[in-house]
A protein has these predicted regions:
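Alpha-helical structural signal in soluble globular domains
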Residues: 30-34, 53-57, 92-97, 116-120, ...
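A general structural signal for well-ordered alpha-helical segments in protein cores
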Residues: 28, 50, 87, 91, ...
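Short, well-ordered coil/turn segments that N-cap beta-strands
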Residues: 37, 76, 99, 126-127
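Hydrophobic residues in well-ordered beta-strands that form the structural core
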Residues: 23, 63, 103, 128-130
């Protein structure tokens, strides 16, 4: 990832695609609260809800179109928080723009989509992450322990 950042700038400048309920209460605030992480823009179909999100979270830019946020040169990483049926298409657009991508679970709708995303990001040596945050929650750790 370091090679994808601008020289003398180790800040990840995020664009969020799909700033809805999942983003609002789970992952979203971390993108601007963590050190060396800055939330530059969000993309949401509803202009009113998108601009409201920006105002409440002090996000400088709003887009209603995926292609527009991906063309923002200030952004150097993308978080996809849209319905799973859109993950593959949006991930491929991020890949085409050489943007490291963090995708809300599940990565794809099925094995074929998931494998396609993983393999194409690997081929380009581009960082790809999936938001499997629940695996660190106590009830899931307990279930894992029981299974093992």
């Amino acid at each position: 990832m370091a090679s994808l950042l601008k020289e003398n700038d180790d800040t990840v400048r995020w664009g969020i695609i799909g700033a809805g309920a999942v983003c609002e209460v789970k992952s979203g605030p971390a993108f601007y609260k963590c050190d060396k992480s800055k939330l530059i823009a969000i993309c949401r179909r509803s202009e009113q809800e998108g601009k409201d999100f920006c105002a409440r979270h002090n996000v400088p830019k709003y887009y209603s179109n995926v292609d527009d946020i991906l063309n923002d040169n200030e952004i150097n990483a993308i978080y996809i928080s849209t319905p799973p049926s859109t993950h593959h298409e949006i991930a491929m657009k991020c890949l085409a723009k050489n943007l490291p991508t963090y995708v809300e679970k599940p990565l794809g709708r099925n094995y074929t989509e998931t494998l396609d995303i993983v393999n194409k990001f690997k081929q380009k040596k581009l960082p790809l992450f999936v938001a499997y945050y629940r695996r660190s929650q106590s009830k899931f750790l307990h279930a894992k322990k029981l299974i093992e």
